[in-house]
Amino acid sequence: MSSSKVLLFYKKTSYDHYFLAGKKRSSTLKKLLAPRDLKRFLDTHQLHYATLAGVEKALRLRGVRYERFCRGKAFDPSGFGLVITVGGDGTFLEAARALKGQFVLGVNSNPYWSVGRFCAGTAHNFSGLLARWIAGRSRVLVLERMQIEVQKKKYPALNDILVSHQSPGAMSRYALHFRGQKEEQRSSGVWISTAAGSTGAIRSAGGRVLPPQSRQLQYKPRELYHGRGSGYHLKGGLIRDGENIRIISLMREGVVYVDGSHVCLPFVFGSTLKVSRSSHPLNVIWR
């Protein structure tokens, strides 16, 4: 175990936000929802916090020092050897953005409902995963990340990014630069993903599923506009290790979404985006 100090990074539930945050809104929602739907929100809430309590109990029983942190605000992971996330993939991805060399263990607090593809842990197997971590026998999955550079500012991404107009109903206009080719395009946006993200949105857009530990990235424009004179060549493909792809915004209100919707970077007319493989992969504790 590289460090005995653990950061416990957890989410609040939909029940917290919609039913416990304000009495007036809670009363309105309870009138609108069917009893079985309301029960599902409550059951999910209770299961999440039961899992969180179980994780804390296991940490205390093994004498592990830890600090709790609720997602939604910036945090400093330095000084922690392990970050444990309790929630689903959204919680995992939010924590992962800040990590630089730390190990991360995802615990899916509701495997029946929550997507937890990056989460090796559950309420049932967490104690065993923790025991192996303490003994130095954990299986570590090294996942490649990509580096995003927008206007000379750099950001990491584990899953994928979407370059598009800020309105989903508006056309996205941009210029792609890849392997010596430059092409202006009109579409619904461009997906760029890592291997870890290749089973998600980019797959639905027509991309390929890559081996989990592949060092390649891939890009895929979505819903290219096929009007007059729009014979496109850069319709998607792999970005090899050592290569990069650049996109220049031709939109007044363009954006770059990083690993979901929580991180949204302005991408106004003339802005340049450069994407390549990051030299800082993520160390994930696995089953």
What feature does the model see in each segment?
Residues 81-82:
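Structural motif
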Residues 96-110:
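A short, gly/pro- and small-residue-rich
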Residues 109, 195-198:
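Conformational gate/switch positions in structured elements
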Residues 85-86, 106, 192-193:
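Redox-cofactor binding/interface segments in oxidoreductases and associated redox assembly factors
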Residues 91-96, 198-203:
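Short glycine/serine/threonine-rich phosphate/pyrophosphate-binding segments
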Residues 2-12, 17-18, 27-31, 35-36, ...:
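Catalytic phosphate-donor-binding core of small-molecule kinases
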